[in-house]
């Protein structure tokens, strides 16, 4: 069972390699809301997102048998970058299947880090191909979010932000498959149970809200959002119960909300991020943050900054 001791072990394991990311004040949003808003800038982590944490924790705890045949993964991009980087540190081969609409910037970045990248269909088709490759090649699957070692690595974000924001009363965190918010939830439940943890999803990829409505993980037939890093069609068997127990509310934001948040972060907060990283700010700007406590600081997790010049032009 994933617990606070496991998160602390992961944090110590990662500490020699990965930096503590800064907590950046968002002055404009603070003035608008009349309370302090902080941005946990995982966009400044190695490989440009929090995903390096989980990937490296997985590699550092893997057995020889798990590594012997090489690794396989499915990713919209950030898990691909994080795993390719971590695997290169360990000298392990990795094959990644990405949907055909994946960011060209993330595809090329993963290949530059040494991964074999296969583009195939949508996210559901990409998963089907990876399962075949696991059988055919003897790969070990490294799930992007539904693995306790991955979740524990991501949970180091929660330990950091609790140290950095002692007056925080709420954390808003993006949800794709739920690995990051699950890890943060383990930390907050153990160390600051009064803190309210709120998940934010794009309307076109609200897989956790769908799971809550269905009473368990249930696959979305269609995923459509500019926030490709959050485009998981189904949440995990591990992440669903963790989120159901620890997340007090979910919010969904529209593509228009997302565009406004991107402009705010780029030009107001002076922070380059990718669309999936902007959903928490989008919820606050659109006043879609449910169940916010009346007092205390707000922390918004900014999950990544991996976007190419062509994608950046959409917001300039």
PLM segments and residue spans:
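PLP-dependent amino-acid enzyme catalytic core
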Residues: 1-316
């Amino acid at each position: 069972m994933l617990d606070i001791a496991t998160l602390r072990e992961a944090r110590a394991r990662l500490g020699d390699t990965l930096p503590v990311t800064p907590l950046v004040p968002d002055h404009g949003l603070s003035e608008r809301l009349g309370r302090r808003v902080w941005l946990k800038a995982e966009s400044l982590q190695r490989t440009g997102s929090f995903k390096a944490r989980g990937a490296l924790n997985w590699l550092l705890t893997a057995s020889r048998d798990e590594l012997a045949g090489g690794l396989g993964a499915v990713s919209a991009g950030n898990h691909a970058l994080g795993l390719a980087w971590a695997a290169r540190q360990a000298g392990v081969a990795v094959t990644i299947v990405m949907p055909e609409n994946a960011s060209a910037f993330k595809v090329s970045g993963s290949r530059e880090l040494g991964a074999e990248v296969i583009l195939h269909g949508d996210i559901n088709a990409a998963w089907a191909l990876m399962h075949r490759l696991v059988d055919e090649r003897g790969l070990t699957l490294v799930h992007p979010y539904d693995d306790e070692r991955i979740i524990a690595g991501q949970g180091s974000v929660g330990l950091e932000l609790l140290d950095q924001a002692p007056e925080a009363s709420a954390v808003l965190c993006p949800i794709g498959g739920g690995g990051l918010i699950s890890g943060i939830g383990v930390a907050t439940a153990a160390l600051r149970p009064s803190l309210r943890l709120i998940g934010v999803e794009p309307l076109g990829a609200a897989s956790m809200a769908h799971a809550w409505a269905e009473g368990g993980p249930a696959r979305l037939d269609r995923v459509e959002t500019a926030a490709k890093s959050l485009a998981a069609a189904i949440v995990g068997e591990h992440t669903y119960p963790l989120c159901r127990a620890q997340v007090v509310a979910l919010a969904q934001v529209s593509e228009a909300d997302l565009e406004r948040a991107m402009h705010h972060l780029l030009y107001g907060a002076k922070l380059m991020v990718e669309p999936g990283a902007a959903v928490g700010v989008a919820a606050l700007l659109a006043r879609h943050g449910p169940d916010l406590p009346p007092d205390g600081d707000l922390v918004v997790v900014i999950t990544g900054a991996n976007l190419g010049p062509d994608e950046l032009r959409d917001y300039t």
